[in-house]
Swiss-Prot record:
It comes from Glycine max. It comes from the Eukaryota. Residues 1-82 form the DhaL domain. InterPro entries: DhaL_dom (IPR004007), DhaL_dom_sf (IPR036117), Dihydroxyacetone_Kinase (IPR050861). It is an enzyme of class 2 (transferase). The keyword NADP does not apply. Belongs to the dihydroxyacetone kinase (DAK) family. It holds the Pfam family Dak2. This is Putative 3,4-dihydroxy-2-butanone kinase.
Length: 82
């Protein structure tokens, strides 16, 4: 879908231009969302699919970054939104 490709391109752009740990974390976040959205066969993305993409992104950042709720990281802002 267009949404999946846009999210994937955001992740690629961040990976090319943003250095340090933040760049890696944001790249992981957007690439995980891209994977979930791309799996959708619909031309439009539903709110449920956006929520699933956010949950997958949070899980990926937690997995690769080693943080979880309460660690005072980006995840503390994202988890309540999911």
């Amino acid at each position: 879908s267009d949404a999946a490709e846009t999210v994937g391109e955001i992740g690629s752009s961040i990976g090319r231009s943003m250095g340090g740990t933040s760049g890696i974390i944001y790249t992981i976040f957007f690439k995980a969302a891209h994977s979930v959205l791309k799996a959708s066969s619909h031309s439009g993305v539903t709110s449920k699919q956006w929520a699933e993409a956010l949950a997958a992104s949070i899980a990926a950042v937690s997995k690769y970054g080693g943080a979880s709720a309460g660690y005072r990281t980006l995840l503390d802002a994202l988890i309540p939104a999911s």
